[in-house]
Amino acid sequence: MVEYMVKKISGIIGLILLSIVMYIFMEVQVTIDSPNTDKPIIKEQEVNEVSEWITIPTYDGANEVTHPKILYFKDGFNGYKYWMVATPYENNDTYLENPSVVVSNDGTNFIEPKGIKNPISGYPSIKKNDTYYSDPFILYYKDHFELFYRKTGSIENGKYISNGYNYLYHMESINGIKWFSKKIILRNDSYERYMSPSVIKTRNLYKIWYTNYDCNMKYIESNDLKKFNKPLDVKIKNFDKGVWHSEIQYKGGKYYLIFMTRNNYLYYTESKNGINFDEPKLINTNLDELKGTYNYIYKTTFILRGNGIELYIPYKVNGRWKMYHKVMTLDNFYKELNN
């Protein structure tokens, strides 16, 4: 009797174990992508390709902006997935060129977030003169935003210089609405100029790229935004046209650079160390609908997300600034680069 019960229990346990094994086997058959690999299938995020003109609202009501920088939060931040800083620039009026923040949940329809007071930088001077702000860059690190932007003036302490006095400013925000701690981090240098900065922050180290008036890209770094190393030259393989405005991002062990030249061509390149970049590829910014118009582009911002890329390209078309929004799969983006 005891032997019979043992055999019966053993049989039941065996059936249970067999069922478990079969279930696991069936699950594995679903998740492996071939008999020769144990890597699970990872479904790539679907990319809905888009090419459209969008409106970026401005505090002056003209809705013309330039020099955008976009951030994307997958799960949203303070109610929004997209946070953009840009500068109004109707009629290329530098007095309006003050960093301002707008938000969106779809990357197409932007609004000013509730409670914000744009321009977040304020105005560069009480009265309109040759002093202006420009070239904003925004990042999010741990629990707060940081904003970098440039101030330029032709006259300081009664002394005039033709190319202007240049400073790099810094501000912070916890919620993206209220901004504080406005300070100068880089003072006037007659050669460097600090145009179009890009900043990557890691473990309290600020990595900063900018362009000088000779269209040379430079790299500096700092732990505290008080002391900086001597500028290093950024090199782009087989390229001697000079960099005008640019944006650098870091993702997956690579630095990604999209930059424009003074003759309004847009390029893409990559680097492993942020100093030596590969030979750049030309991004096609010619639009059939703009044939017969007088137009040119400006500093472009981008989002690398999953297997897609999102571009925001300012165009000035017949005297008016417009924003072009383009979403592509990375495969199609790279194919266009190689054509």
Specify the residue positions occupied by each region the protein language model found:
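N-terminal Sec-pathway targeting helices
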Residues: 1-16
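Sec-dependent N-terminal signal peptides of Gram-positive bacterial secreted proteins and lipoproteins
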Residues: 12-26
